Amino acid sequence: AVKSGAKFNKDMILAQMKEFYTQCELYEMTGCVHTAKLFVSEDKFYIGEDIAQHNTIDKAVGKAVLDGANLANSFLMVSGRLSSEMVVKAVMHGIPALISRTAPTSLGVVIARKFELTLCGFARGENINVYSGEERIYE
């Protein structure tokens, strides 16, 4: 299970999601890649871009690990759907929350609940759907 006392403000998450899409440089140039952003603190984040969505997490987390970042209070934003594989990657790295502007798969939700990962989808505008780990999100 993901053990973390991290709490995340809903408005801060939505602001970071909005900013996230301004930081997807390769997507802006090509229109055909996925992006992941690992948010560690207001001034520390790591971006991973790749044509394969799963690789974006590996790239962002790899940069953070090489930099010695503590992931216990971080959250991960991804550009695509929240599949079971994406959820497993977040759990394996001890990242407490995984967020996307799109939907989770049903198996992704089951795994997130089993391993106490906060899973949020449709994070856009002023809305966010929390599918598991509601206790980490506050107004």
Segments predicted by a language model, with ranges:
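Feature captures the catalytic cores and cofactor-binding loops of soluble hydro-lyases/lyases
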Residues: 53-131, 136-139
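Short beta->alpha transition motifs characteristic of CBS
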Residues: 49-51
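Intrinsically disordered, low-complexity regions enriched in acidic/Ser/Thr/Pro/Gln residues
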Residues: 1-41, 46-47
